[in-house]
Amino acid sequence: PRNDSKGIPTETEYVLAYGKNPEWTPKKLPRTEEMDAKYGNPDNDVMPWTSDNPCAPGAKTHQGMVYAIQHPFTGEMLYPAISSCWRYEQKTMLVYMCGWCEYELKNLKDEAQRAKICGIDANEVRKDIKGIVLKNGLEESKAHAQAVLKRGQWPRFYFTRNGNGGIRRKTYLENVEGKMVTNFWPYTEVGHTDEAKKELKALFDGEIPFDTPKPTRLLQRIIQIATN
């Protein structure tokens, strides 16, 4: 804004977007170095990853994905957060957990706990859902899990705090998409009015043939997210 502006100067402009299809979704932008910097490789995995939520919403409608997973280091029974379920179906989670030590399915008669997570009455919860529990004793299971922890390249679902913390999920950099388009485009990315005026002056021998020109970078952004 100008130094002699009155009141509170405006620093935003609005671009109206129209589409024939109400289900239209803009294309994602290229990822930034800052976004990719959040991905690392603390366990010497084959590709960089970041720590992610092991759960997903929808416990009430996905009762088959709400159950206990026994911690291989502490023996604690872990459940999804209230109203949440595990990210993947049980047979997939069982495969991931067997990457730490041997596991099996067992009926824990934990209907009350699962009903609480799902937000339903205990008599409404499914009775056939088993927990993923250690197949062998805790000491044997823990020793195997500690060997995996020391070896590196941990399974997709891992345990924080050197094995003593909660469960988390790896999200690999190669599997994530670009940057989501929002309704705020900073001038550092798409330019500003002064930049647009300078571009016009360069094209029209110092003249600005029309008011409120738009910078080339803004037009490029619009084309980038809306076309192939």
Predicted features along the sequence, with ranges:
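Class I S-adenosyl-L-methionine
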Residues: 1-227
